[in-house]
Amino acid sequence: EVKAAVLAAKENTSLPVFATMIFDDKGKLLTGGDVPSVVAMLEGLRVDALGINCGMGPEQMMPILDEILQYASVPVIVKPNAGLPKQKDGEVYYDVEPEEFGRFMAEILKRGASLIGGCCGTTPAHIRAMVEATKDQRDITDRPGKEFKNRTIVSSYGRAVELGGKPMIIGERINPTGKKKFKQALKDHDIDYILREAISQQDAGAHILDVNVGLPDIDEPALMREVVQELQSVTSLPLQIDTVDISALEAAMRIYNGKPMVNSVNGKQSSMDAVFPLIKKYGGVVVGLTLDEDGIPATAEGRVKVAGKIIEEAKKYGIDKKDIVIDVLCMTISSEPTGAITTLEALRQVREKYGVCAVLGVSNISFGLPYRPAVNSNFYTMAMQSGLSAGIINPLSEDMMRSYYSFCALMNYDENCEKYIEQYGSQ
């Protein structure tokens, strides 16, 4: 609802757009959304300020404000009720008096809010007391929490996934490439088959689901829109919208309930001209493929150069590099013997030079080879060690997941090896 409202406002006015939400005392929306997922979506939509209103009093809002300030780079709004509603002699009243309200709002400004006001139960006396209590705190240029937050986050309606720390898994199975059954399911409009693939990947440990429904002679925009809507009804995992069809991309981004990953843009000017306006309008974390008009560079340095070109062009649209993840691409070693070495070196250089997150379609490395899982799983470990933020993999592959859980345990991403023991403790 708030995404629809923000888009409606932005499409019909050039005025600043603010958005506030009602959270409960656990920091959740009534529909289950949490603070990072809300902030990620609203900042992706480029609201001018965001925050909290209604639902509770100023004291109860402070922990939620503190959490918002961990994620938000735009100014934060706080508009509490005059405490909590109570009844006396059949009449409803609020339990925070004006002077107390003013003291709480002064503390809220000190914590980092930039815009303050009142909601249910507040009166002119409450606002007057708030103004008086905060009269010496009007300079917001050095407001705590106002600094830029360099956090790469994708979200669904109720779950946020942050890239840049523990490696994440992007499930690759909702994609017709090389999958006869999936192709037939698309042709037969078998949506249940697609939903089963989503649920199985979620159960296997995926954090994000890639969604590609591209086939010849299929109305891809209509099908992509339908599949995204249906997936959102059965999984809370964020989605990666994977298409080269710009109409399909916009159809999905417009109705997507959150901040998606977008796969992809590349270094060709035509690609950036088409994709970046959609990222600017709808919000998203876009995958930048390191190829351009000259193809895929043969060297790591060449791919890093294309990555820089993508990052610089994105700036023209106000897209920060925290909303770009780079795919340095991997060529199968069956035809390009140094393909893995080049990819890993490019991966290291991109992470070091630009400080962006990185993804890879890991299984491409073994195309044309026998017993591909052995090559894939070993390369996956090497890529994670080189700085891979998220691998696009098959989470139903025992070899790949064994590599993943082992790596996380070895690198202390798995506290006390709990996940590893949970998976393999009975073996």
Give, region by region, the residue ranges found by the protein language model:
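Domain-level signal for soluble alpha/beta catalytic cores
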Residues: 1-325, 331-427
